[in-house]
Amino acid sequence: MLPIHLNLTVAFFLALAGVLIYRSHLMSTLLCLEGMMLSLFILMALMITHFQVFSVSMIPLILLVFSACEAGVGLALLVKISTTHGNDYIQNLNLLQC
């Protein structure tokens, strides 16, 4: 395993640990999720170039598109919770149900 692969794997697991540790605030959780998605994107792009499998070269871009959609939905939820409740606690997500 190359050192860059090891670094990106450690970055992914640190972001995963951040999701588990900072799960009370929505903003912290969203930042950790973005870190996970970014490390996955870079790791997949490096793996494709390292193994020279160019038939699946669009998968990192698709992952990046889904990551942008996830960020947009997460920020919309953050704005909705912040305007209605004044804070970004995740336990307020249960109050948004119809």
From Swiss-Prot:
GO terms for cellular component: mitochondrial inner membrane; respiratory chain complex I. The keyword Oxidoreductase does not apply. Core subunit of the mitochondrial membrane respiratory chain NADH dehydrogenase (Complex I) which catalyzes electron transfer from NADH through the respiratory chain, using ubiquinone as an electron acceptor. Part of the enzyme membrane arm which is embedded in the lipid bilayer and involved in proton translocation. Core subunit of respiratory chain NADH dehydrogenase (Complex I) which is composed of 45 different subunits. The chain crosses the membrane at residues 1-21, 29-49, 59-79. Belongs to the complex I subunit 4L family. It is a multi-pass membrane protein. GO terms for biological process: ATP synthesis coupled electron transport. Its EC number is 7.1.1.2. It is found in: Mitochondrion inner membrane. It comes from the Eukaryota. Gene3D superfamilies: 1.10.287.3510. It catalyses: a ubiquinone + NADH + 5 H(+)(in) = a ubiquinol + NAD(+) + 4 H(+)(out). This is NADH-ubiquinone oxidoreductase chain 4L. Keywords: Electron transport, Membrane, Mitochondrion, Mitochondrion inner membrane, NAD, Respiratory chain, Translocase, Transmembrane, Transmembrane helix, Transport, Ubiquinone. The keyword NAD applies. GO terms for molecular function: NADH dehydrogenase (ubiquinone) activity.
